[in-house]
Each structure stands twice: as C-alpha cells, then as structure tokens.
Amino acid sequence: MQYSFTEKKRIRKSFAKRPIVHQVPFLLATQLESFSTFLQADVPATQRKPEGLQAAFTSVFPIVSHNGFARLEFVSYALSAPAFNIKECQQRGLTYCSALRAKVRLVILDKESPNKPVVKEVKEQEVYMGEIPLMTPTGSFVINGTERVIVSQLHRSPGVFFEHDKGKTHSSGKLLFSARIIPYRGSWLDFEFDPKDILYFRVDRRRKMPVTILLKAIGLTPEQILANFFVFDNFTLMDEGAQLEFVPERLRGEVARFDITDRDGKVIVQKDKRINAKHIRDLEAAKTKFISVPEDYLLGRVLAKNVVDGETGEVIANANDEITESVLEKLREAGIKEIQTLYTNDLDQGPYISSTLRVDETTDKTAARIAIYRMMRPGEPPTEEAVEALFNRLFYSEEAYDLSKVGRMKFNRRVGRDEITGPMTLQDDDILATIKILVELRNGKGEVDDIDHLGNRRVRCVGELAENQFRAGLVRVERAVKERLGQAESENLMPHDLINSKPISSAIREFFGSSQLSQFMDQTNPLSEITHKRRVSALGPGGLTRERAGFEVRDVHPTHYGRVCPIETPEGPNIGLINSLALYAHLNEYGFLETPYRKVVDGKVTDQIDYLSAIEEGRYMIAQANAAIDDEGRLTDELVSSREAGETMMVTPDRIQYMDVAPSQIVSVAASLIPFLEHDDANRALMGSNMQRQAVPCLRPEKPVVGTGIERTCAVDSGTTVQAFRGGVVDYVDAGRIVIRVNDDEAVAGEVGVDIYNLIKYTRSNQNTNINQRPIVKMGDKVSRGDVLADGASTDLGELALGQNMLIAFMPWNGYNFEDSILISEKVVADDRYTSIHIEELNVVARDTKLGPEEITRDISNLAEVQLGRLDESGIVYIGAEVEAGDVLVGKVTPKGETQLTPEEKLLRAIFGEKASDVKDTSLRVPSGMSGTVIDVQVFTREGIQRDKRAQQIIDDELKRYRLDLNDQLRIVEGDAFQRLARMLVGKVANGGPKKLAKGTKIDQAYLEDLDHYHWFDIRLADDEAAAQLEAIKNSIEEKRHQFDLAFEEKRKKLTQGDELPPGVLKMVKVYLAVKRRLQPGDKMAGRHGNKGVVSKIVPIEDMPYMADGRPADVVLNPLGVPSRMNVGQVLEVHLGWAAKGLGWRIGEMLQRQAKIEELRAFLTKIYNESGRAEDLDSFSDDEILELAKNLREGVPFATPVFDGATEDEMAKMLDLAFPDDIAKQLDMNPSKNQVRLYDGRTGEPFERRVTVGYMHYLKLHHLVDDKMHARSTGPYSLVTQQPLGGKAQFGGQRFGEMEVWALEAYGASYVLQEMLTVKSDDVTGRTKVYENLVKGDHVIDAGMPESFNVLVKEIRSLGIDIDLDRN
C-alpha cells in the first residue's frame, strides 16, 4: 500500500469493514468542469463543441439586416490572459476576469442582382465583447475583490409533465388531470380538464380555450380530430333498427339494453343482463359478424364522419352530430346504409374530445388561429399576416422557442418514442401525442408524473447559468445590430462600429454581482467553502420561492439516494429547498444527478462501476453496500436487503443487478464527517452537519482523534492546504516560502526545474477569520506529486481539524451546566486551545470635494501627541501598533466651507488674532468595541498623483519579495547547470584558460573548485563538440537571466502604474487589524452531533472534577442533554476518543522509557492490524516508525466511517489495549473501562457514582459574544419617527416593545413609563429640555409630544381626514 509523505507521519486507524472500491471523486469537480465547458478556453477554435459561449454565439449569429443585403457572421472567439492575478484582484478590489474578443465577418451583398445573391464585399475583424469573470482553481470567482460562489440550481427539467390536482380544486373531490409542456425557453403550453370533462389549453397561463381550437389551428378537421381520439362502431341501417358490427372487447361488461341473438335468432343474452365472458364465447362460437340492434339504440349516438348525399352532394349530418329521429329519417331518405359512430363508454373510453368539439365555436383553421391571436393580443386587430406570424412564433420558431436537448429527450421518452433526438421546436405530432396521453390518463390508463422525482428535476450549474445570461446580452446586441446593418454599406462601417458590448458586459456583471444564485462565499473554514460550492438550490430565477414551496418539494424523496444528502439542509424557511450533493454524486450530460453502483452478475459483485441516473435506477434491483460478500465477491446471504423503484425489500442474490459503492454514498461531505452518524437522530445530525460549517479556525488546529477517514480528502480538495505540483526535494523552507527542486524525470525540458510556493500569511477571509498557511516539510525532504507541503486554516498534517479534542466528563456541576450550558476549565483558556484570530479590514478614502481635495496627513489639529505617536510621517499607522476603540489609524482632513462665527468666537478671534483652520478632522478611527494589532496596510493612489513615502515603501517591499523568488529560481538553475558542466569538464583536455592553464592539460576537480564558476566559460577546450556544449550552457544561463530580468521589469511596471479607483477618489488606504479572541462565557460551542451549548462559566483548574491521577476534566457537560436528543453518537465518540488517547499515552510511555523498536512495532501492529482495515507497517523503516510513534503520543487517530464504523466489540478491545488492568485499577474504572471515579476539585471527595469520561472533538462556533455585545447611551435617530435606530451595526438602542410596556404598567411605574415613551424615545424637544435641566441641576422631566404621534396625525391627514390636537 502506498502512503503519501504526510500519511506516513500519522496513520489514521480505520474500522471500515469493506475495501475501498471507488475513490471519492474530486469534490469541486461539478463547478470546475461546468465552467471549463462554458469557456472552452484551451480548445482550438475549430474544434469547439456547440456548448457554452460557442453555443450562445452560434444561436444568435448570423445577424441579417431587415432588407437581407447585409449580414454579420460569427467566426470564432478568443479569451485574453487576465491583467491581474487572483491575489492582486483581491487587494485592489477588482474582478478576476478575461477580455472576450470575437472575430466576426461582415458580408455585404450586391443589391443590383436580386435574383442570385452576389457577395459585394467581406470585412473581417476582431471585436471586443466585454469581460468574462474567470473561475479560480478552487471553484470560486473574485468579483470586485471579494470571493463569490455561483450555487447550482435544481429546477424542473424541460419536457412534458402530466399531473392531477389530487381532488383539491372541485368540491366533489374529482381528479382533474392536466399536462404541461415546458420548454427551456419560450411559451409554456398547458392542457387541463375542467370538472365537466371538457379539455382546455392555455398558453403562458393566459385565458383557457377549448383544446380543439389548437387542433384546428394546426390544420386538423373535426373528422380528423375524432379519428385521432376514438375508435368507431360500424352500423348498417335496416328498414327497422340496424345491424352493429360485432367487436367482442366492446361488449364485455356492458348491460344489454335488448335481447342479443345469434344468426339463427337464438337469444344469447337476455335484456338487462350484464354481458360476461361466457356470452362473448357463445357469440364467437356462433360465428356472429353482426348484432341486430333496435332503433332507439342508435339515438344519442355521435356520428364520426360527415354524411353526404351521394347524388346531390348535400351534407345531411356533420361529424360529431348526435343521431336523432329526424337525422335517421333523412339518412334513410337519402338511401344511406353504412354509418360510423364514436365508440364511448363510462369506464375507459370517455367522450371528452367530442364534448370539447361541441363547446368550440370556431369553424376552420383560420378562425382557430384568429381566436388564439385574440387571446394572446387582446384588443389588437387580427390581420392575416399578424395572425400567421404570431402562431408560428409561439411554438415553431427556433428564435422564440427552444425545447433543448434535454427537453426533447425527456419529451420523446415520456410519449414513448424510441429516438431521443429531434427538432428543438414543437411539432404538430408532439401536441397530438401529449393530448392523447392526457385523454388516456382521464380514461384511467397510465400514471401521472412525480414532479419531485430527480428524473424530472435537473441541475443548472455555473456554466449553464452564465451561458443563459451571456445569450440574453447577445440578444440585446442583436436588436441594435439589426437596426444599424442597413447603413453598413452606405456609411462604409466596420464590424466594431456595429457591435456595442455594453449590454453583454452589464448582463454578465449583473449575474455575477447581484443574482440570487451568486453568493458571498462562506469562508469560515475549509468545510464551509466546499459545502457552499457543492450546494444545490431550488430557489433563484426560474425556480421556486420560499412562500410557494409546499411540503412535498422540501421532503426527502427515494431518488435522493446517493444524489442529494437527506441530512444536510438549513433549518428555518429554506429547509429542503437548499440541499447538498452526496459524496459520490455527479452530473450527466443532460444535467441529471447520477450516482455510482457496482455491477452484480449472477450474484457475484464485479469491479465494473456504472453511474446511473434516477430514471435508469428505477429499472434495477440494487443491494446495499453492507451486504455480506465472500472473498470471491459472491453475495452470501439467502435474502439480501435491496431497493427497486424506491421500495425496499428482501430478495434472493440472483435477482440483484447492482450494489452500492460505499456505505457513505447517501450523505454529503459535512454529514460524512460525523463519526457514529448511524447512532444519531436525523434532526441532530442535521444540526451537527450545519454547525461544523460555523467552526472558527483555532490558533493551533488539532486533528480529531475520532474521525471518519474523509478528513484528508476534505482538506486537500478544499484548496486550503498547499499541494506539490511535481515531485522533488525541498531546497529551502521558511514560514512564508517553500522552494522545491523538481525531479529530473518530471521537469519539462527548457523550463526552470523549480517550484516556488508562496504561502498565504494572516489573510482575512470573507467572514473575517484568519487564513494562514504553515509549512510541514523540512529542508531535504523528498516529496511526490500531490503531497501536502503546508497546512492551512483548520487543517493539521493535511487533515481537516475544525476544533480541539477535549477531555469531557458527563455530570451535573452546581447547576452551571443546566439546559445545555457548558462548563470549561481555565486551563483550556490559558493554553489558548480555542483562541482564534479575526482580521478586520478598515478603509478610508480621500476624495476630491467641491471645496478642494481631502488630504491624508499626520498634521491634524486638536489631536494629542499620544494619538499621533502611532502614525508615520504620511499619517498612516505603523504595522505592529496595538490600538483600542477610538484610536486614529489614518489621519485625514477635509476642507470645510466658511462657517458663521458666534459672537463669543468673534471676540476670541479679535483678542488672539488666530484664524481657525478651515479643515475638519475626518480621520479613520477604530470603531467602538474593537481593539487589536495592525498587521498590514495597503495604500492605493490614483494615476497622476504623487505617492507618499509609505506607498513607495510598500511597493519596494513587494518587489524585494519578488526578486527573492527569481533569485532562488536562478540559483537552482545555475546550480544544476554548473553541476552538469563540472561532470562534462572533468577529464577533458584544454587548449588554455584562466589561471595560466597550459595547452594540453587535463582538467581536474581541484582546478575547477579553485576557479570562480563564471570563469569556467573562459576555458578553451580541445574537443570541438564539448566546446559547443559549453557555449550552449552559457547561452541558456544568460537567456534565463534575461527572462528573469524581463519578468521583474513587468512586475515593477504593474506595481508602479496608478491604481484603478472609483471616480472622485484620489487615494485609498486599507488597514488590517488582527483581533485575538479568547474563549469566554457567552461563546457558543458544539460537538459534531448537534450537541450545542453556551459557555456558562470558566472554572479554575483546582475546582474542576479530577481523576485519581490528578488529571482534571476540560469540559463538563450535562448528561441530560443526551437521552431526549437521541444523539448517542456523542457518547460513543467519547468512549472511542478515550481509547485513542489511552493508546497514545501508552506509546508515549514506551518512548519515554526508550523501549526497543520491536516492542513499538508489535504494539502498533496490535493497534492497526487486529481489526478493521489493515495497514502495511512492514514497509516502514525504523526511523519512520519512530516518527510515527512520536506523532501518535497525543492519541492514535481513529476513523470510524459513516454506516461502516467501529462496533462495540472493537471499541471494547481498544479500551482493553489502552487501559491494562493496573492502570484501570489505579483510575478506579468500571469493568468496561469507559467510566472513571472522579473527585470534586473543591472538597477532594470522590463523587458517589463513576462518571463517563473521554475525549470529544469540540468546536467553537462563529457566534462569539464579542460580536454580539453592544450598549448605547445616545446615538443616531431615525429621520421620520425620530426613534433610535435598531441593531449593533447602526449603533442602535434596545426596543422597548409592547410587552415591556405591560410590565411597567403592571408595576404602576407611570413616570418611568412616560420617560420611556417620550424623552428616551422620540420626543425631540423633551430630549433637549432634559439636557438643559440636567446642566442647570434641576432634575425635572417636561415630556412633550412624541414625534410618532405627529407621524400618525400626518398619516391620517393623508387619508383625507382633517384631524387636530385640542391642546386645552
């Protein structure tokens, strides 16, 4: 088994019972693949597939002018390299994007030859089409300097859907069936039955009309309509009664309305008897061809065809007319013998279309189309052209209507056609097929569709959403181009004169900047990033709304299995509308979710893995991943639990066709990180998976001792860690840079064989948490491709580490852990276990005002020297300064207009003669409630404005860092070159050289070492070939130096050019403050099982409950939090964590007494290989075993995968191994070694019962009391009501609401109440009065009129009611 560089350092013992058959796919693949298909940037222009940008261009172009003599054709498009890299865009507040240029061709035809088009001239040109934001390698976008994510949307797939109203519309509870054809874009077409069984259609939810109008509009006559929907009964008219052609199926089950006889007149069925199978057999036996029916049997029947008098050509009766006695008389008079009527019955052949045809008043195709025109455009006169154009545009025009590939596939599948391709517009037979199926449904045949089935909902990813926006922009451009194309020839215009890219840019900008699906990335920790990118939302444009979404849409559906996680979804109004992709889920070409299964043939599991969509899955019998299998892969149980079409059942192994890939297949990333998930209640698991996303990265991340084995995948795929692009040797490493000399076999010829990784240091995330990377390699380490070189936030040795492992005791403690409160030891705070760093960004801009420019300066009047002491000569705070609320960070003055002086000021001015400065202090100060250390400052200056010293210094530092990187690369390149040179030169004969090298001397190593490397090139070699090689190496080194100098110049140019700032801004300064947050009462904490609580007290170490060996507990939790919540997983985690730590202590004890390496190996083998998945420890060298043991001292990490985790027996074994009898006795453990005797820290007395003690991975969540604590004395007031604002962000007050008023009324505190409702709230005059009274020492309140009363009076007056206050 192959271990990576980091895995060797610390192996996680897995309790999994099944081998890994399918690796978890790359977690961000959905986003990255979708966007790369949209751009197709690396595909040559001629080989691009018709998807993404290419599809958008080809769907809109060519654009033809109104007169048809000029057209604009699309040739290809190209994307330029982005001007700034991702980091520069974030610093400067820019969008990371690329310019899109399209090559278009303007073709002008000769107007003189109207019959045959002759090309007069062709102009080809590249035209700028706007900027397209680019995706970062981690699947996000940088828009205006902030990282955003485009969430995928789950929407109803295009196609045709049949449903009924579940009997809710009509009072009788009758099921009303309906069908809807949904295109990707274009008009929706609905068909619906009303309670009277008339079939209607409507376009785009407008007024409904009888469906036969639509059928006539597509060219069918009433006869054809009836022939399409009914079978006919054939009658031969006699002088009395008639003969009915005998069709057995149509008679069975009917009640005979007359005696039915055979040919010989023998009665086979008596009148009023029900016709059964025996009667039919008798009639068939008698070879009956016709049945004689009486006259009244014909009355009320409906004619299927027009009946025409053969001689006169006169129409006697129309199709769909009922037969009456007068009609029969006319038929007999005209000598017509044969007639056809519609066959209908009450059971499975209703007369719906016939009834609809009666309601329909239109006569022919034209009338039907006019009726549709009137419905779509009420009030407009229907001219013939307009009517035709509108009808054709509705469903038949490719510009206005697009079913899409998916829609056509779904449509054809639903109406039972074999081929899945076809035209993208609606065809006449499509409409007919839909109506036929709907009528069949009403007749009781077939099933309605389930709209929550994942075969009927598809995912729209970034690429598709962006393509739709881009197309919308192009369509706007098309309209403008059409107008101008007419003038193209006369005014000799070029393509760039025709195309204005503004509409495209604005459509794209609006989508990425403010669409509902473009969200501010949740960057609290690596898990929250991954989850955000794997999220699937049913909301957004073209989706559902929170208010309209019912229970069914939100519910878990059987087809979610392995596609969408049944656990992870938000609590609250969005529950079930926002979901997360399951671990192995993946999208197929149509956008439907697929999940992998192992193929099973004749009860034997193969290695073949097939991805099935929800529709395909319904056809197979699928076993679960935990089905018992022998070594050959045969299913061993007699009956296997399996699923078919959403139903679970037990079947024999030979019926199984597929099997799940892994037990964790059904859950998402966040849920699969919860150990013992199978023992938690679903609601708590939901909270657990949501709260892991809110865990704040700790100062020193610590891996969970009990994990699930998915932690490494999660950390690596999130992009928080640094991975090696290529293998090699670590050449240099410090806190901020890692330099790797690449292996020769991986280096590309002619390229620099050096990889330099600049680590991210103390950077602010979107949520103000700290992103910091720490190297985990040493100089000289050999690394392979994909190895983790540096840890990021919340990762430890390449594994996700969201919290800390805490020693937990489940026991009450003086009521301090009542109702989920958490009691924490002071030691946890002292050791900085949960200390986190938060970084705040504060901005100040100097603008150009009407009165003159604002200035950033140190020269500010009325400021104490203490305040100015932190600012440098440019007026900007020093890095490293510790600042409190109210301190000045950047000095800024704004010119102010001439002010009117008060008489006192005039007097002072006259005496002292000082002209008051005409600027006011508008410096950037630290906001209230914040303090910290300045860790970075960035200064941006507009083009053409002199940079201050600080800005220049920042640029110089950046260039210095860049030069360091280049020097490192050069050093390694030159080192390699000189090594090759030395190997080549030693032993060669020289013709002369430096240091008086004689001709014919053989060069040796000592001579070369004595010479400066650059003088080696001065050696003249006798061998011409070697001399040429020497020259080539010299040239390649000089070439590299030249390249590096060019790169440095490029960087310098980029840094020294002015910054792009918003209009009117001259200078912008960003100051970054690092705030250290220690754990304190009021902070929210949680485990991974939804067991959340608030810290109630931090207790001194000496008062905490402790064990017999003096070790105090870190956290005391209330045992009552477990049973009612049913999340027993936390207790199991504590037990296994206890074993993990115990094993670590035993290994530590062995290392301390310097036990033999064999003993260590034997103990490690016992841990790793006696149960669960075996590890290959024999492949480790002694040094590696030693390093492994050192890393295991703090606890052997365990992995208990979801649904395939540690059993009770395995846990008991591990506890026995961790706590031999002597240790167990010393700690006074119970026999199963998971409870310990604890002693009260205050009295030293042992507690009466043993206590469950162990280690749990505990998280600190992003709900910190520091961010919520807030107080106000005076502050801003609302303009209209004059009441204080609300909320911390507005520095608002606390609302004194209705209930609080009742409380004061109950106490009879009338004056307090009056004060609350007037001077403390919105009585403006009263407020000033109170202040004056207090200054005078007169403590009296004169309450005036509350402003809200005045607002009420104004509102009543606005209703037209005159109201006045009677002040008497």
From Swiss-Prot:
InterPro entries: DNA-dir_RNA_pol_bsu_ext_1_sf, DNA-dir_RNA_pol_bsu_external_1, DNA-dir_RNA_pol_su2, DNA-dir_RNAP_su2_dom, DNA-dir_RNAP_su2_hyb_sf, RNA_pol_bsu_bac, RNA_pol_bsu_CS, RNA_pol_bsu_protrusion. GO terms for molecular function: DNA binding; DNA-directed RNA polymerase activity; ribonucleoside binding. PROSITE patterns: RNA_POL_BETA. The keyword Cell inner membrane does not apply. It catalyses: RNA(n) + a ribonucleoside 5'-triphosphate = RNA(n+1) + diphosphate. Gene3D superfamilies: 2.40.50.100, 2.40.50.150, 3.90.1100.10, DNA-directed RNA polymerase, beta subunit, external 1 domain, DNA-directed RNA polymerase, subunit 2, domain 6, RNA polymerase alpha subunit dimerisation domain, RNA polymerase Rpb2, domain 2. One of its GO terms (biological process) is DNA-templated transcription. Pfam families: RNA_pol_Rpb2_1, RNA_pol_Rpb2_2, RNA_pol_Rpb2_3, RNA_pol_Rpb2_45, RNA_pol_Rpb2_6, RNA_pol_Rpb2_7. It is an enzyme of class 2 (transferase). Its EC number is 2.7.7.6. One of its GO terms (cellular component) is DNA-directed RNA polymerase complex. Keywords: DNA-directed RNA polymerase, Nucleotidyltransferase, Transcription, Transferase. NCBIfam families: PRK00405.1, rpoB. The RNAP catalytic core consists of 2 alpha, 1 beta, 1 beta' and 1 omega subunit. When a sigma factor is associated with the core the holoenzyme is formed, which can initiate transcription. PANTHER family: DNA-DIRECTED RNA POLYMERASE I SUBUNIT 2 (PTHR20856). DNA-dependent RNA polymerase catalyzes the transcription of DNA into RNA using the four ribonucleoside triphosphates as substrates. Belongs to the RNA polymerase beta chain family. This is DNA-directed RNA polymerase subunit beta.
